Amino acid sequence: MKMNTLKPAEGSKQSPKRLGRGIGSGLGKTGGRGHKGQTSRSGGTIRPGFEGGQQPLQRRLPKFGFTSRVGRFSEEVRLSEIDSLGTDIIDLAALKAANIVDQQAKQVKVILSGEITRAVTVKGLKVTKGAQEAIQAAGGKVEE
């Protein structure tokens, strides 16, 4: 066997049907497009969601909800991430400096995920009840 003699197994590659090559081909004349109408024409397509003039689904359904402008700048931090930080005072600036939160973050919430093994002081961050209990159990404190 040589690289220049490689070829697919017999019958594994079926050649595609050619369009518009006579009645006997099965795809002659109209070439699988049917008779008349927009989609039979060259360049004729209908936009996604078009239902033939009937009110389309995306217009029948009501609008609801909105995108929170605060959510874009809010982040969550796990206790395990705080534990890995070298500083004793945890605030927004310390988290940004350690690249734990995005530089654009304006609000950070500490959540109970992982463990904290040392005493830290959390300043100016939102903290869940479970996370607050875990921080206090480790000898730390939470300040507003």
Curated annotation (Swiss-Prot):
Keywords: Ribonucleoprotein, Ribosomal protein, RNA-binding, rRNA-binding. GO terms for cellular component: cytosolic large ribosomal subunit. Residues 21-31 have a biased composition (Gly residues). Gene3D superfamilies: 3.100.10.10. The keyword Plastid does not apply. GO terms for biological process: translation. GO terms for molecular function: rRNA binding; structural constituent of ribosome. Residues 1-60 are annotated as: Disordered. Part of the 50S ribosomal subunit. Binds to the 23S rRNA. PANTHER family: 50S RIBOSOMAL PROTEIN L15, LARGE RIBOSOMAL SUBUNIT PROTEIN UL15M. Belongs to the universal ribosomal protein uL15 family. This is Large ribosomal subunit protein uL15. It comes from Hahella chejuensis (strain KCTC 2396).
